Amino acid sequence: SPSRGLGDVYKRQAIDVVSGEFKWVFAISQITYGGGALVAPDGTIYQCVRNATINNVYAINPNGTQKWAVKLDAAIGAFPALSADGVLYCLTNKSTLYALDASSGAIKWQQSLDGATGSAVAIDKAGNVYAGTSAAIYSFKSNKEQNWKLEEVNVTEQATFALKDQVLYATLKNGGLVAVDMTNGTKKWTYPTTKGDAYFPIADKNGNVYFTEKGSQTVHAVNASGSKIWEKNVGNNLNYSGGALSTDGILYIGTQSNNKVLGLDITNGNIVFEETVGQQVMAAVSIGPDRRLYCGTIGSNNIGSIKAFAVNKTLATDSWSCLLYTF
């Protein structure tokens, strides 16, 4: 979480999910924002940060100590991606795609892409890498060989892709969703919207895709053919809002205005869950294996908190809130 104090300090915290108590804090100076943390199977945390003058990719051990850090060619707003064979892919704001050795941070290869901004990166089960910028979407093999390139696509910054049944779904700057054939890079369809940047697509087991739209306070549901299932105006700003999909068919999202986390029935978009969290939510929410929702919030002076609360209010373990102070 970014905070203001003696200079700008970004603190990656580890918090006990049962009690809400801090386990450790890892501070990174002089940065503001960056894509969310990626946690590897061995517990290593990888964090990219949006600053070009300091180390901007960090690997943090499970105990909160630094494993390695490296400086790439520009600030990084995009979320990183980790392959099964231990390669960390990072896409900088200069639209340079890097493949790093996840164990050491050594650069294996790098590739300059078209576009003023690097937006999103993902990996499929075969190890192919997908990168989206403000100008195009690319697919590469793990050895840097390019599979294909789809031009004239402006992917929303600080974004993610959804991959489902050999189709890549990307949300677009200035609104909309595009579906791309992952085998050859052809555009299958575009679902246009008109009210501002679209964020964080998420696909369910049936291939339906859900995404949020900044300007219209709307959550969209689209089927695998690109046809509308429903759209829901939730009456709250959705700035950098991403959803979490539960196994029982509820899409949870956080809102910037009205300081709420909402749950929408994915069959019809009806709001079936609502929790006031007291501060703005400007990021994706998460569902833990304990059936609790976790969200980060931000308030005045960029002082935020991590909140956890049970979806099922009959659970004995209900909720906690952990304040992230400036220091």
What residue spans do the PLM features occupy?
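Conserved beta-propeller blade signature
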Residues: 4, 45-46, 88-90, 98, ...
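Blade-level signature of beta-propeller repeat domains, shared across WD40, Kelch, NHL, RCC1
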Residues: 282-324
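Short loop/turn segments immediately following the C-termini of beta-strands
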Residues: 8, 50-52, 93, 134, ...
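A short beta-strand motif characteristic of beta-propeller blades
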Residues: 21-26, 66-71, 106-111, 146-151, ...
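Short loop/turn segments that connect beta-strands within beta-propeller blades
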Residues: 16-19, 61-64, 101-104, 141-144, ...
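Repeated scaffold domains used in trafficking and secretory/extracellular systems
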Residues: 31-37, 75-81, 116-122, 155-162, ...
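Single conserved hydrophobic/aromatic residue that forms the stacking wall/gate
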Residues: 1-10, 325-327
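Residue-level detector of Asp-centered blade-edge/turn motifs that repeat once per structural unit
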Residues: 39-42, 82-85, 123-126, 163-165, ...
